[in-house]
């Protein structure tokens, strides 16, 4: 007799009742399950998505019930389950015993296949030795309780190590049937409907079985264990005990478990006991590894407090939000993401069902802070809410809805992960810029410390950097101050100074002066980040001809903004800074070959170097009264950079003492230069200058200036130079003779001969100021 589709359903379920979770709104059951707690499948092999409506107001919302069932419909394409009554709370013991019986009945190839699957899973979940601690934390997080307002209640977690066991207890929601079924199998999909969970396919939890041969759970009225020695007694065929739940009475527990179970507070709703295959103390380094890392709780949404108790020593770990800057972003799963999932599944890649229904992706960043300073992190890993072993080599934490491998060794080379990493780079650019959106929000240099270097790496780092670069070009992300106003500007509007003139450590020109002189519409980066290596690297990558500032631009400023530039460079300190910069950059020659009228004279005027004497200090001792006739380099500028200016001394005006002497003497009477020589010292000095003036082999061979104010030995101006003599003993005696009129002989002041005496003697003697020589 041919079987109907209903007969096939009955044959599959082999039970008069099924199980479902009750929803008070509209009064129905869903998440339909068989007597062993397994999800009922449709004829296409996928879990059935049906609602079984009932009329019963006494049931509790969210609780699982078992009820007698029936089927209405005409074919496998058109049927639905119905409730025939006999609604009761589930018999937890019976459900576990049914499941255990099903597993124990596996024979031959079924048993071998199950064992091989378990071995494969063990290999997949075997990563770093401490991975199982992560998974226990993950399970603590994934089902927090809610308060009366629907807000999540923070979860507290305890790890307790005793002689033989590692215990995990937490205050999250108690286990329900769905949770129990999930840990009794793999890929049951208990989290597929809850996209907020950080676990993703139930396999991670299986890591607790890698080094433990006994795992006990007490939660939500469930008491069960997974026990290798019970399932596989010596001499029996080996079975995959990790999926065989054993209903456990309190009398089945040893005193060590009972003691801890009785000691925990009532707010702890989940109790695990893990017995190590060798020595429970082997858990200690793994606990230390995980909880020595103060980053461990950053991305776990609901766990806020953990206690680790080893040998009665308590270590407390709290989520310190004051220490961390954490930013979450949500990306909608668009058509591109959906196509990636579709393509990955066509390739045969494992994509958890949770991701097939996910509508939004979370990308998060975190970094520590100390006051207003951001503190970059070292040796960071990529997070999938808990850390993987995959490095990204960035100074901050990155967390996202990646698909990791179950061992958390790294990220599989999936297009989904690459796409998220690309988008993460873009979101990082936005987050990074937001840290600078207001002045004094954070120390700007420390914000730039967050930037990774732009060099390549593995595929995930490359994707991240690619996404970052693409986004950073389009957003305002570089801080500037202009006209006293702080703001962010796009990179394309930031001046890329290749000259170093605006270098923050050796700034030649103040920002305000630069803007006032150059009239540039583009902006200089904030001085706090201008010399930061990451900023320099970014500018180098994104520089264009349009925003590059080179030495040609400096020349343009000097020539095209002449009035403003001259006003600025007339300041002595500015002039020194500008020359120091040109010399340091070895650009002085090339610049002054084009424009050079920015050399500061001692008079305060600006000149080209060929119009200025560089150093005539030794001559001005004698002819300082004619300084206005001798344009020279500003003394402070010259002396500050004397060594540097030697490299261009040929550019300055040459000082020829002989020509200067001739010019002054020629114009002496016409220009009334005598009025400048208004004391003995000046008169002495100028005569000395004339006497020693030389240019090569040439000397001054001209006359004395007419009406030159010579001073006699009494310090008075001599009115008749023809009566002026150099004093010697003969002349002195002669003047004393009684028959000699004293006015006939005037002796020139002896100061004229204090320096270079012979030269001055000779010079004056040749110009009719001799000694009185007796004629015989």
Q: What are these regions, as identified by a protein language model?
A:
Residues 262-369:
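Glycine/threonine-rich ATP-lid/beta-loop region of ATP-binding domains
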Residues 7, 20-22:
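Structural detector for short beta-strands of small beta-barrel domains
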Residues 28-80:
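Acidic, low-complexity, intrinsically disordered interaction modules
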Residues 86-263:
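GHKL (Bergerat-fold) ATPase N-terminal catalytic module, capturing the glycine-rich phosphate-binding loop
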Residues 145, 176-179, 226-227, 281-283, ...:
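Short helix/loop capping segments that flank catalytic or ligand/cofactor-binding pockets
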Residues 86-109, 356-375, 385-387:
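Long, contiguous juxta-domain segments that are non-catalytic but functionally important
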Residues 71, 138, 161-163, 170-173, ...:
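Short, flexible loop/turn elements at secondary-structure junctions
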Residues 117, 148-153, 255, 266-274, ...:
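Amphipathic alpha-helical coiled-coil/helical-bundle segments that mediate oligomerization/assembly
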């Amino acid at each position: 007799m041919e079987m109907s589709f209903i007969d096939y359903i009955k044959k599959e379920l082999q039970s008069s009742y099924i199980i479902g979770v009750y929803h008070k709104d509209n009064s129905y059951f869903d998440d339909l399950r068989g007597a062993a707690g397994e999800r009922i499948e449709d004829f296409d092999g996928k879990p059935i998505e049906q609602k079984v409506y009932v009329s019963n107001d006494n049931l509790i919302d969210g609780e699982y019930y078992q009820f007698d069932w029936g089927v209405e419909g005409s074919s496998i394409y058109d049927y639905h389950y119905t409730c025939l009554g006999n609604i009761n709370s589930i018999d937890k013991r019976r459900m576990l015993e049914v499941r255990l019986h099903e597993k124990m009945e596996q024979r031959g190839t079924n048993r071998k296949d199950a064992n091989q699957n378990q071995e494969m899973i063990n290999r997949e979940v075997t990563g770093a030795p401490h991975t199982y601690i992560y998974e226990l934390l993950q399970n603590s997080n994934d089902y927090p309780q809610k308060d009366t307002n629907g807000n999540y209640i923070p979860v507290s977690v305890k790890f307790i190590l005793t002689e033989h066991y590692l215990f995990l207890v937490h205050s999250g929601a108690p286990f329900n049937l769905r949770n129990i079924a999930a840990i009794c199998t793999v890929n049951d999909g208990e989290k597929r409907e809850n996209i907020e969970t950080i676990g993703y396919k139930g396999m991670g939890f299986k890591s607790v079985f890698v080094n433990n041969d006994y795992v006990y759970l007490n939660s939500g009225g469930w008491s069960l264990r997974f026990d290798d020695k019970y399932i596989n007694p010596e001499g029996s065929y080996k079975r995959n005990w990790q999926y065989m739940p054993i209903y456990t009475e309190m009398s089945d527990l040893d005193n060590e478990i009972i003691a801890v179970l009785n000691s925990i507070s009532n707010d702890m709703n989940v109790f695990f006991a893990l017995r190590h295959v060798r020595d429970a103390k082997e858990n200690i380094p793994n606990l230390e590894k995980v909880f020595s890392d103060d980053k461990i709780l950053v991305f776990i949404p609901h766990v806020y407090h953990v206690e680790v108790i080893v040998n009665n020593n308590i270590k407390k770990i709290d989520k310190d939000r004051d220490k961390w800057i954490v930013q979450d972003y949500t990306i909608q799963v668009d058509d591109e993401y959906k196509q990636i999932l579709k393509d990955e599944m066509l390739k045969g890649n494992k994509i958890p069902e949770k991701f097939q229904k996910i509508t939004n992706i979370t990308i998060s960043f975190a970094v520590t802070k100390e006051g207003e300073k951001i503190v970059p992190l070292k040796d960071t890993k990529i997070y999938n809410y808990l850390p993987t072993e995959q490095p990204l080599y960035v100074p901050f934490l990155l967390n996202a809805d990646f698909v990791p491998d179950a061992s958390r060794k790294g990220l599989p080379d999936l297009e989904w992960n690459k796409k998220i990493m690309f988008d993460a780079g873009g979101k990082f650019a936005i987050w990074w810029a937001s840290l600078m959106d207001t002045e004094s929000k954070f120390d700007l240099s420390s914000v730039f410390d967050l930037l990774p270097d732009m060099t390549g790496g593995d595929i995930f780092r490359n994707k991240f950097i690619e996404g970052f670069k693409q986004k950073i070009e389009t957003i305002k992300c570089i801080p500037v101050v202009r006209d006293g106003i702080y703001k962010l500007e796009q990179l394309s509007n930031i001046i890329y100074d290749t000259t170093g003139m605006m270098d923050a450590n050796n700034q030649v020109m103040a920002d305000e002066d630069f803007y006032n002189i150059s009239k540039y519409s583009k902006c200089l980066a904030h001085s706090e980040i201008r010399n930061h290596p990451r900023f320099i690297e970014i500018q180098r990558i994104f520089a264009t001809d349009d925003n590059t500032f080179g030495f040609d631009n400096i020349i343009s400023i000097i020539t095209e903004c002449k009035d403003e530039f001259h006003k600025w460079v007339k300041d002595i300190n500015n002039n020194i800074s500008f020359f120091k910069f040109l010399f340091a950059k070895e650009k002085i020659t090339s610049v002054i070959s084009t424009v050079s009228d920015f050399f500061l004279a001692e008079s305060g005027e600006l000149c080209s170097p060929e119009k200025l004497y560089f150093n005539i200090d030794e001559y001005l001792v004698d002819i300082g009264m004619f300084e206005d006739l001798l344009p020279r380099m500003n003394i402070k500028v010259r002396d500050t950079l004397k060594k540097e200016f030697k490299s261009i001394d040929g550019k300055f005006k040459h000082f020829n003492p002989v020509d200067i002497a001739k010019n002054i003497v020629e114009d002496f009477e016409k220009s009334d230069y005598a009025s400048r020589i208004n004391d003995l010292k000046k008169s002495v000095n100028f005569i000395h200058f004339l006497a020693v003036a030389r240019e090569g082999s040439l000397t001054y061979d001209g006359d004395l200036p007419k009406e030159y104010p010579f001073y006699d030995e009494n310090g008075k101006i001599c009115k008749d130079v023809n009566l002026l003599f150099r004093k010697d003993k003969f002349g002195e005696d002669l003047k004393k003779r009684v028959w000699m009129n004293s006015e006939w002989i005037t002796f020139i002041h002896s100061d004229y001969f204090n320096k270079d005496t012979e030269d001055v003697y000779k010079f004056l003697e040749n110009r009719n100021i001799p000694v009185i020589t007796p004629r015989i």
